[in-house]
Amino acid sequence: MTDMRRLGQRAKQASLLIAPLSTQIKNRFLSTLAKALVDDTQTLLAANQKDLANAKEHGISDIMMDRLRLTSERIKAMAQGVQQVADLADPIGQVIKGYTNLDGLKILQKRVPLGVIAMIFESRPNVSVDAFSLAFKTNNAIILRGGKDALHSNKALVKLIRQSLEKSGITPDAVQLVEDPSHAVAEELMQATDYVDVLIPRGGAKLIQTVKEKAKVPVIETGVGNVHIYVDAQADLDMATKIVINAKTKRPSVCNAAEGLVIHEAVAARFIPMLEKAINQVQPVEWRADDKALPLFEQAVPAKAEDFETEFLDYIMSVKVVSSLEEAIFWINQHTSHHSEAIITRDIKVAETFQDLVDAAAVYVNASTRFTDGFVFGLGAEIGISTQKMHARGPMGLEALTSTKFYINGDGHIRE
């Protein structure tokens, strides 16, 4: 069983050792790591094959296997993400504001590291590298606890990172992997208030809920993606068809894939047959439709209440027909996970109302929800997509992994 106390102590000590690292040293190391990832591709693929074989033996679906799978191209993309983080401006030490107060005190507010970040995540091994690169660039140590399905991949990736750190003369304890997959150890990490400054969970609804219930350390919640697309009465239906197909079928296992379709009744009778025919030529989808939408499909099943709350991560989509923009907004706000939402419309005023009133971290007009991603938003590799409103919201890049500190300089000042 993992000794969480010892692991936490090492992480805390490492956070103090890497706190003074300069931007130049950090960037040089990240460039070295990016190259090492590509150079070690075959070793990483061999480790990933063990995870894939185990997953296949346990009957994991093809879509979930896709979340777990590493390929040469995906490793190359990981390396590019690391290099992009190296190329980004360093937020640490950035002066947010500076002024002299009425007493003559010189006051600066600067960005500083959080300290030790803990990350609990599922399936995707690339999270290990993405999370480490962002944490390291912001002078934070990180503790990683991945799912048991990706254990071999995560061990290989973290081993590579630690070896690269050691070769560069930097403490390898800047990254630690919790290899014990037990829930008991995960709960220990959630409650490690002496060592962990913030915990970021990244996974399905069950994981997020467990963290919310069990954690004693501060948490930045990265929610599930119950993502909707609303096709308005003034929508370009050809555009809507293209966007829905992309958002649902391109990669259904990711959190920015669309799960719910909301359609204005004025266009439902034209749009549903048009969409169904077009999507069947790409990838058939199981439609779970409400009473108004159901008769408009050639093939669909009646939706149950829970279908409108579900992140399917599969070729399944709920469908709701509404009579107004107001009803669409109300419906989405009732069922959203506050991740990403989209409207297809040619009416600028309708679009602005939707963007203002829908409660989500990212709200799109005439674009696929698949763009909600730190890399796409220019943040470099993301550590997660926050669906809460405090501290950080949306794709979390470098600034989300910093806090602030006030630096006050005086000359013998005392307060009378």
UniProtKB/Swiss-Prot annotation:
Its EC number is 1.2.1.41. It is an enzyme of class 1 (oxidoreductase). Catalyzes the NADPH-dependent reduction of L-glutamate 5-phosphate into L-glutamate 5-semialdehyde and phosphate. The product spontaneously undergoes cyclization to form 1-pyrroline-5-carboxylate. It catalyses: L-glutamate 5-semialdehyde + phosphate + NADP(+) = L-glutamyl 5-phosphate + NADPH + H(+). The lineage of its organism: Bacteria, Bacillati, Bacillota, Bacilli, Lactobacillales. One of its GO terms (molecular function) is glutamate-5-semialdehyde dehydrogenase activity. GO terms for cellular component: cytoplasm. It comes from the Bacteria. Pathway: Amino-acid biosynthesis; L-proline biosynthesis; L-glutamate 5-semialdehyde from L-glutamate: step 2/2. It is found in: Cytoplasm. HAMAP family: ProA. Belongs to the gamma-glutamyl phosphate reductase family. This is Gamma-glutamyl phosphate reductase. GO terms for biological process: L-proline biosynthetic process. Keywords: Amino-acid biosynthesis, Cytoplasm, NADP, Oxidoreductase, Proline biosynthesis. The keyword rRNA-binding does not apply. Pfam families: Aldedh. SUPFAM superfamilies: ALDH-like.
